[in-house]
Amino acid sequence: MARAGHAYPQVDARARGLMDGRVVSLARSLSVSRALEAMRGAKARSALASPSTAALRSDLERAASWQLGHLRWMDLAYPRLPVLEARAGEIVVRRQLDGGAPLVLIREGGRLVGMVEASAISRPAPSLAARLDRLHGPSAESKLWVLRMVGKLGEDQGQAVFVVGGFVRDLLLGAGTFMPDLDLVVEGDGVAFGRRLAEETGGHLVVHAAFGTASLEGGLTPDGTPLGRVDIASARGERYGLPGALPEVTPASMEEDLGRRDFSVNAMAVALSPSAWGRLHDPHGGERDVGERRLRVLHPLSLAEDPTRIFRAARYVARLGLRPDQGFHRALALALRLGAYPAMSGQRLVGEIELIMEEPDPWRVLALLLRWGAFRLWDAAYRSTRTSLSRLSKARALTRWARGAGVGLDATELALLALLFDQAKPVADRCLRRLAVRDPAARLLDAAPARQLARRLDRAPRMRPSQVAEAVRPTASPVVLGAWLCGGPRARRRIEWFLAAGRGARPLSSGDDVMAAGVPRGPLVAQALCVLRDLKLDGRVRTLEDEHVALDRWTRALTMKGDLR
């Protein structure tokens, strides 16, 4: 174990004394399985491919547990690691680890003799109490109230309670980025603690027993301010049986709980008990990464462990201005290479698109994912092209227009259209099956009918409004949106007119008015109302009296033809 040198500031421990594992040099071509055999035989915690490239045994063991022993161990290696002499002081080691290195290699007598892993070095726990106390505004004050209350409640029950994840990250970023929900972790029974919290706040608790978690909704502060959603969980470890599968959970400490998380910026916790109020737990250097706006995974298989983290990462990059580091991009390339993740349901993938569409700029998020090649998770043959990016840009313009015109659109449907429109039909069909989008929705997302409608609207130089409505009205919403995405300016203008005005047009006359004019109950009533509606669209009738005159003319014509008796 690493020596807790920080507890004795008068001692300048050397790098050799801080080493927490041996290293062994291996050929780059070895598989994970063969590398593990060699490491176990040498009782080494790290494998070396060069003086500055190494992989951790724990990462190789994780890969082997997923039947990925055939991978090259180098796929899980960290390149360009710092190398220090064994006589280097602890301060030098800490400086390298604080700079973002996952481990430091130690050299003595011209050869590498060991390593110091970042998570093995104790760090001082700074206090964020002053930041918490400066929170202001109704929403922030209600958060502060519940944080103090749960800390006191936990301390009275002998349980440590922490706020974790996004709240801590956003607290460090600045109040302007605050999200509405709170995530609490209890070292103990989180569900039982949630029930007590529901009693205190009058909220409704939804329990997810399989994961030891609960969600509180509808809670109020003593002055009646809504608390928003509060998620409560037991501190837990997770084991992924397969890449992309939902994890198996086991009780764990707070430190272990933080180690299972996606990114370092989310792997922080703030203690809430009165005796430790505001103390930051940051074993993975998240505070430093927040300060440098860096997005860093906790291990090379993080994105393969849970590929939905790729979509989450794009949201953080777009909304928070975080920059993925090289380790993220290596983990991304590995995750996309590993395959289709059959253990991950299509509903989870669609759920990620739905979450993206709630972001301030969802189209930027989707464009990032396109550039990263992330939609190969839907199908290995998915291709990201300039045309795909152009469709996203047009979709953004359509949503901007719809917002201004007060027209409601299905954002997820539009996103799927924009992302699949230019894929080969077999690829698009496989993507829809992967996403569990079934008929008839899958048929409606076919690009061919949309292209036909766009051509019809683009090519006709003159169309009466009623003719435009006749062309568009029978068409399902995905086809109309697809026609807007692929059509020219004329088609887009006509579709916008229909969505904003033509779709909702109704005659002033009712069915009773039509029957009073002598039209018998039945299909002819609906036909008469359609005629009046089209006349109204074309500006040929404006008042109820105009409609009565037109209806009288129409019924006489039917009578003369013998269609109305």
Regions found by a protein language model. Give the residues of each.
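Catalytic cores of the polymerase beta-like nucleotidyltransferase superfamily
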Residues: M1-R45, S58-R565
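Acidic Ca2+-chelating loop motifs
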Residues: T53-A55
